[in-house]
């Protein structure tokens, strides 16, 4: 038996952004950047470790909107063009920097090599479908993939029982479609919990969820082992809470590893640094400058201005990632030894949940850190064993019964990020749509029917117009409920886009509802909305009935 258990949990999520009405769209780059910098590197690392005999073990949420985007042919095609454009620029850069700067030339060569490797993985190994790659990793025992709320809806701010239930049940149905099994666990959007949510999870046959630290620490009764063992609610749903120490070592802007001077600087990008005419062929048709992903500078120092940043040296950054991984493991061993003294002879569990996008997008060397971490865990020590929450539940260790408290992992630990003076205007519209959705479901659902996972092969054109409208009403409500819009408005980033997205889904909901009320179907408009917001082909509106 090890001294301690460690559970790395990655949360891979992006809001559903797909704009077939335009030939290209800036916010679709969120997905494309994440594929290049996060998902492809992590999948490749996990598979390489497994094939080399150093099998990693971790949990990962691949959210339903992300699954739907990764499996979408339009977005797959657009990503391929995005990557080919980036490779073309990188090749130009390799030629340009050869004469101008040896330091920058080494970085340009690195980009050419890594991007060409990414294109090969994308086209040839993974056949442009990363959902299948994640599924294979789960089938091979590397990942325990968990689900998330259907569109990352913030459950405590959803007004009706039926709309909350739908966020869970639709997520489960979508998970089954993509991964061919039932999810054991769920990452509640923003780790947002309030008492009663566990009843919805139990109904959906979900065994556990992830919470923030204070959900357990302030629960009733006081947790005997703090956050270093799960608790279980009265109805049997387990709760795994975030460990503070590991969170700070990676997340903290002051002491976290990603802030090291040798790591790549995120904000210096060729899209802004290079001559405009030089990069213009690689910009969108609007010609507006944007991040392109090729960055040549290192952090250098926290207080060093952007124009004083020094050249990025990949070899030094890689060595630092290895050093940080060793330090992280050493700290986990010390932590486990200290905790074990009060744990009645069984190993403590350290749960470390992070946004997956930290590893590769915000922290370029993050995938290297994970690679070194699992190699060193396997080859260099025996005190720490990496497991998933499901593995812990399967161990049969006794778990304390507790009622967790309301919480989220947002600023200050509760709900203010998602409801405040900047975004509170959204909720009357959302809550009205939630109420009306249940009214429509009650009116049109077959009496006595129960929600079943529908066949994903069911063609839209074979459904009755009323059924198509009702299912699209559900999609528009779900997309409006995405917590990403309120979060980005609070953060002050992409405020216009987030506001417009929320408003457009409410507007489409109202237009569709008016069709239903009048009994006059605008076939052309309905087809246009279905083609634009095509998430969850398998959806069944009757889940909203009470």
Give the positions of each predicted feature.
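Acidic (Asp/Glu)-rich catalytic clusters
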Residues: 2, 47-55, 129-146, 165, ...
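CE4/NodB-like, metal-dependent polysaccharide N-deacetylase domain
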Residues: 164-188, 331-344, 348-351
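Conserved short loop/turn motifs at secondary-structure junctions
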Residues: 183-193, 355-359, 494
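Intrinsically disordered, low-complexity repeat regions of secreted/extracellular protein precursors
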Residues: 448-463
């Amino acid at each position: 038996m090890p001294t301690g258990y460690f559970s790395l949990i990655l949360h891979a999520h992006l809001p559903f952004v797909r704009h077939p009405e335009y030939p290209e769209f800036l916010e679709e780059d969120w997905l494309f950047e994440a594929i290049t910098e996060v998902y492809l590197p992590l999948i490749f690392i996990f598979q390489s470790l497994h094939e080399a005999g150093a099998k990693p073990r971790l949990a990962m949420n691949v959210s339903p909107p992300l699954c739907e985007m990764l499996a979408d042919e339009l977005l797959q095609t657009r990503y391929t063009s995005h990557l080919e454009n980036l490779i073309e620029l990188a090749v130009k850069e390799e030629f340009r920097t050869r004469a101008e700067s040896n330091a920058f030339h080494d970085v340009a060569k690195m980009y050419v090599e890594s991007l060409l490797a990414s294109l090969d993985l994308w086209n040839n190994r993974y056949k442009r479908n990363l959902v299948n790659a994640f599924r294979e990793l789960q089938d091979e025992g590397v990942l325990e993939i968990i689900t998330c709320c259907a569109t990352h809806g913030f459950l405590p701010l959803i007004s009706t029982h039926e709309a909350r239930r739908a966020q869970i049940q639709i997520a489960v149905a979508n998970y089954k479609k993509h991964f061919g099994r039932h999810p054991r666990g769920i990452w509640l959007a923003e780790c947002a919990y309030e008492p009663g949510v566990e009843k919805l999870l139990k109904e959906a046959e979900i065994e556990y969820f992830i919470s923030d630290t204070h959900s357990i620490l302030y629960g009733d009764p006081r947790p005997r082992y703090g956050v270093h063992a799960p608790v279980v609610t009265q109805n049997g749903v387990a709760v795994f809470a975030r460990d503070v120490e590991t969170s700070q070592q990676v997340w903290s802007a002051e002491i976290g590893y990603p802030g090291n001077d040798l790591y790549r600087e995120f904000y210096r990008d060729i899209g802004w640094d290079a001559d405009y005419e030089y990069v213009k062929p690689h910009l969108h048709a609007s010609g507006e400058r944007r991040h392109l992903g090729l960055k040549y500078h290192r952090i250098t120092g926290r207080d060093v201005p952007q124009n004083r940043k020094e050249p990025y040296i990949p070899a030094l950054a890689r060595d630092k990632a290895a050093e940080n991984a060793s330090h992280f493991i050493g700290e986990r061993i010390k932590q486990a030894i200290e905790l074990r003294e009060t744990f009645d002879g069984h190993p403590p569990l350290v749960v470390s949940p992070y946004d997956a996008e930290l590893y590769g997008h915000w922290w370029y060397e993050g995938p290297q850190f994970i690679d070194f971490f699992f190699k060193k865990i396997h080859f260099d020590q025996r005190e720490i064993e990496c497991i998933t929450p499901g593995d812990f539940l399967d161990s049969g260790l006794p778990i304390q019964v507790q009622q967790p408290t309301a919480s989220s992992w947002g600023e200050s630990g509760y709900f203010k990020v998602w409801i405040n003076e900047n975004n509170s205007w959204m909720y009357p519209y959302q809550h009205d749509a939630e109420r009306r959705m249940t009214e429509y479901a009650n009116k049109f659902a077959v009496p006595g029917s129960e929600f079943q996972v529908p066949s994903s092969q069911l063609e839209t054109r074979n459904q009755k117009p009323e059924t198509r409208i009702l299912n699209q009403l559900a999609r528009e409500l779900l997309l409006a409920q995405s917590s990403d819009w309120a979060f980005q408005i609070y953060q002050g980033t992409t405020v216009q886009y987030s506001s417009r997205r929320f408003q457009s889904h409410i507007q489409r909901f109202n237009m569709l509802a008016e069709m239903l009320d009048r009994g006059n179907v605008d076939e052309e408009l309905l087809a246009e909305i279905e083609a634009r917001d095509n998430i969850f082909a398998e959806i069944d509106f009757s889940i909203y009935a009470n």
